[in-house]
Regions:
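Conserved, well-structured ligand/cofactor-binding cores
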Residues: 24-170
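Low-complexity intrinsically disordered segments
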Residues: 13-15, 28
Length: 171
């Protein structure tokens, strides 16, 4: 019975429009292009998440219950990213300016801001990789904004190389 319910959800869910009556920010408007190893995709320009989160939304629309429904978990993720940025900065692995701006972005998330950009489904493949990447992208894009850079300019602040530095993909 559970397999039938999941299969029905997968067939009927359009992760690019709405989930449980809530818009995911894909209803038109200005977009930006982001590229990963699978190719280039358009992301709503107002979104703090990026291409990895978009792919997770498309690949794992399982329950309709998203990360944003669990603010304590979002705060905990931001605290882990903050601790990593502080440690990497102290060890000289991360530039002071980048470390500071990543910490500022984490503090905003810990204060309850930007939670609407944590969209991945709570049930997903990959041992939490999608949740981790959603957090990395939101933090990186907010850090870019704080630096006055456009979202998606990952050569400046990278979700993988800077926000996720010294962590595994699914920490």
């Amino acid at each position: 019975r559970a397999a039938q319910v999941i299969a029905a959800r997968l067939k009927s869910t359009d992760a690019t429009v709405t989930r449980r009556g809530r818009s995911l920010g894909f209803s038109g408007g200005v977009t930006r292009h982001e590229k990963d190893l699978l190719g280039e995709r358009q992301i709503p320009d107002a979104a703090l998440y990026g291409v990895q989160t978009l792919r997770a939304l498309e690949n794992f629309p399982i329950t309709g219950v998203s990360l944003r429904d669990f603010p304590e978990l979002i705060i905990a993720l931001a605290q882990v990213k903050e601790a990593a940025a502080l440690s990497n900065t102290q060890l000289g692995l991360l530039d002071q300016k980048l470390g500071d701006v990543i910490v500022r972005a984490c503090h905003e998330i810990e204060a309850g801001r930007h939670h609407e950009h944590f969209l991945v489904d709570m049930v997903q493949g990959g041992a939490g990789t999608s949740s981790n990447m959603n957090a990395n992208e939101v933090i990186a894009n907010r850090a870019l904004e704080l630096l006055g850079e456009p979202r998606g300019t990952y050569a400046v602040v990278s979700p993988n190389d800077h926000v996720n530095q010294s962590q595994s993909t699914n920490d």
